[in-house]
């Protein structure tokens, strides 16, 4: 085991604070509508330009191990805020740095760090309660657009695209962001349920121009196993022919004489039919087939349930107003499933999302949820160069998460105003002793940091702006750094999602309180005598890799 270096007390906290400040200073320049860009060097390809706080934070690694520990702890604040609310990462970082800075001064002055932490916790509880109390539900499409615009750094086009997407797919629908191949940003909405499997044979095509199958008012057979034996299909096919309606078969595969017969019947015009392979694999396939069954009001035919193919009746088939199948995708629109059943399935998937620990599983479950609940909207972000597209895509991602958060928990005035107003409430908090009171005071001072930083980035005097905003007793009154005017922030469309602001202060205080209560730090001693690789003579070509 290699030797370790140990730092104590003031020395440890000073080193840590230096790391916190370096990270916070790099991140805070991006805050607000007049925040600046940060350029990140990439080991391959062009540098990346971004205004996204968490992206900047993730790039920072410091040489000094103790400084780096401080920086990494605050980086955790940004990451946690990004995970929880998807935005507010810069605000969280600025708050954390402010709390740590004030807290370190108090500890140096001889106050009890544990009491300071208790005071900080009390203050955060009061701030969250105040945010929730003053939160306003998002009602109109315009408000969603405003949230998106603010989060995308004042880009109204992005706000409008997101509002349109949410209007079309609903709050539960999935919105994905991709890079476009053109200059224009565009919105593409897939209504109904779509899965990535196309027709098994091109002979099923009904629209030769578009090379796709289009059926109206179709029956849907959902089968888990392969279909190769014609005899077991015959009774069902005859029943469907009697109704004169088209049939879509979703199965693991359709092959052999079953496929040949379906194709021949289709070509002769006796039977409107198409077959597609079931989506997904293994257990996920079972779940997706069950989703399709619930959406269309049918039954997933499975031998586990003891249902044999030859015993399937028309009542077991799903129904849909429209089914479209092309070479790669199948879309089912307006399935005949009961609303109650669909809602129960949605609730079940939501519960699984809460419980899962795997990001991949969560993503797949969210896709399934969207397909059942609303649909999928794709925003394709355009731009003149690859660097511009990437930078814009970052902002669209942030804005998308912010609009989601706004719909979930409502909105508060933006520009750091909600936190400023909450800071006034902290003057009334009763504490057990003076050290706890100082903890509350630390948070009260820190709450003005985001508003101050937004003003500084806009070239204004932060302290003057904060003072003027606090003079007025109106909750929504604040400073619009884009125009340089004071006024009602909500009316001006400068709003933040409550969830984003709440997550920012909770995460910032949580990590900052841990840093303040740190008394010792341990890190590996730097290796002496360069980075020669073990067992290799100096200059052996591999040593420090200095080519």
Curated annotation (Swiss-Prot):
One of its GO terms (molecular function) is isomerase activity. Pfam families: Cpn60_TCP1. It is an enzyme of class 5 (isomerase). It catalyses: ATP + H2O + a folded polypeptide = ADP + phosphate + an unfolded polypeptide. Its main location: cytoplasm. One of its GO terms (cellular component) is cytoplasm. The keyword Membrane does not apply. Keywords: ATP-binding, Chaperone, Cytoplasm, Isomerase, Nucleotide-binding. It is found in: Cytoplasm. ATP binds at residues 30-33, 51, 87-91, 415, 496. Its EC number is 5.6.1.7. GO terms for biological process: protein refolding. SUPFAM superfamilies: GroEL apical domain-like (SSF52029), GroEL equatorial domain-like (SSF48592), GroEL-intermediate domain like (SSF54849). InterPro entries: Chaperonin_Cpn60_CS, Cpn60/GroEL, Cpn60/GroEL/TCP-1, GroEL-like_apical_dom_sf, GROEL-like_equatorial_sf, TCP-1-like_intermed_sf. Together with its co-chaperonin GroES, plays an essential role in assisting protein folding. The GroEL-GroES system forms a nano-cage that allows encapsulation of the non-native substrate proteins and provides a physical environment optimized to promote and accelerate protein folding. Forms a cylinder of 14 subunits composed of two heptameric rings stacked back-to-back. Interacts with the co-chaperonin GroES. Belongs to the chaperonin (HSP60) family. PANTHER family: 60 KDA HEAT SHOCK PROTEIN, MITOCHONDRIAL. HAMAP family: CH60. This is Chaperonin GroEL 2. The gene is groEL2.
